[in-house]
Regions:
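Short amphipathic alpha-helix that is part of the acyltransferase structural core
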Residues: 1-30, 133-170
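Conserved donor-binding loop and adjoining core beta-sheet/short helix segment
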Residues: 3-8, 18, 23-24, 31-92, ...
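Short hydrophobic/aromatic beta-strand or adjacent loop that forms the aromatic wall/cage
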Residues: 46, 123-127, 187
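Acyl-donor-binding surface of acyltransferase catalytic domains
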Residues: 53-57, 62-140
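Conserved acetyl-CoA-binding loop-helix of GNAT-fold acetyltransferases
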Residues: 74-83, 216-222, 226-237
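A mid-sequence, solvent-exposed acidic-amphipathic segment
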Residues: 138-213
Length: 237
C-alpha cells in the first residue's frame, strides 16, 4: 500500500492529536510540543512530517534537535526516514523501541556516515508509570524551587546532565540555562535544599499534557546516595 509523506500544519492538528492521544504516555514529548506550538513550523521551530495512506494519518516524525518517530509499520517508518534523508541535523533519536530501532536502521541505510555511529544506544530504557498515590510516605522537605535559588538548582541540573549523558550541557548560547529558567518560570522545578540553601535533590516536570506529566532530571547529591532518600523525595513531587 502506497505511503505518502508531507509536512504537517495546523490544519492537521485534529488527526495528529487523535493519533498521539491514543497512547499519551509514550507520546508525551510530541503532545507537549504541539500543545505549546501547534504544527506550524515557524512557531514550533522545526518541521513535523506525517505519513498518510489514502487520507489517513498513520505515522509522524518530529525533526528537531530530537528526532521522534511515531509509527508501528515498517513501511511507514521507512517512508518517514526517507523524508528525513541522509543529512543529519538532529542530536538524538527518541521514542518507543519499536519505532526508534527500525527507524535508525533505515536512516543508517541512507547514510552510514551520518547515522551509523551513534555515541550511545539505549535500547532497553523502561518507561515507568504511576497512576495512583505513592505507596510510601513523601519527604516533606520537597518543594517548588524558585528563582532565588536558581544558581544552586542550575549547578545540580548541570551535574545531573553531565553524569547521565556524559557531556556537559553548557554551551556559548546558554541554551540549557534558558531551558531551566523557563521550567522554573512554569513552577516545574522541585527540590530539597539544606540549611545553607544548597540543592541536595532535584527533579523537573519536563513535559505535560492533559492529566499526564513526565518527571525527569532526577538527581541526588553524591554524598547522600545509598541512604534511600530518592524514593520518598520522588513521592513528594
Amino acid at each position: 500500500m502506497r505511503t505518502r509523506v508531507r509536512p504537517l500544519d495546523d490544519d492537521d492538528l485534529p488527526d495528529t492529536l487523535a493519533l498521539l492521544s491514543a497512547h499519551p504516555v509514550e507520546n508525551l514529548f510530541f503532545l507537549d510540543r504541539i500543545q505549546q506550538g501547534g504544527l506550524k513550523r515557524s512557531r514550533l521551530g522545526c518541521p513535523v512530517y506525517g505519513a498518510f495512506r489514502h487520507d489517513d494519518l498513520v505515522g509522524l516524525v518530529h525533526v528537531g534537535s530530537n528526532l521522534v518517530p511515531v509509527a508501528d509499520d515498517e513501511e511507514v517508518l521507512a517512508a518517514l526516514a526517507a523524508r528525513v534523508g541522509p543529512w543529519r541535523t538532529s542530536t538524538s533519536i527518541m521514542g518507543t523501541q519499536r519505532a526508534v530501532l527500525p527507524f535508525h536502521e533505515h536512516l543508517t541505510h541512507l547514510s552510514e556516515r551520518a547515522w551509523g555511529h551513534p555515541r550511545a544506544k539505549r535500547t532497553d530504557q523502561p518507561l515507568l508509570v504511576i497512576d495512583a498515590p505513592p505507596a510510601i510516605t513523601p519527604d516533606p522537605r520537597v518543594r517548588i524551587v524558585g528563582f532565588e535559588d536558581f544558581e544552586s538548582y542550575f549547578r545540580a541540573a548541570v551535574d545531573m546532565y553531565t553524569e547521565e549523558v556524559g557531556v556537559s550541557p553548557l554551551d556559548p548560547s546558554n541554551g540549557y540555562r534558558r531551558h531551566m529558567l523557563a521550567m522554573m518560570q512554569r513552577g516545574d522545578t522541585f527540590g530539597i535544599l539544606d540549611e545553607h540553601r544548597i540543592v541536595r535533590w532535584k527533579s523537573d516536570v519536563a513535559l505535560s499534557w492533559g492529566g499526564v506529566c513526565q518527571i525527569q532530571g532526577v538527581w541526588l547529591d553524591p554524598a547522600l546516595r545509598g541512604q534511600r532518600l530518592s524514593a520518598p523525595a520522588m513521592a513528594g513531587v
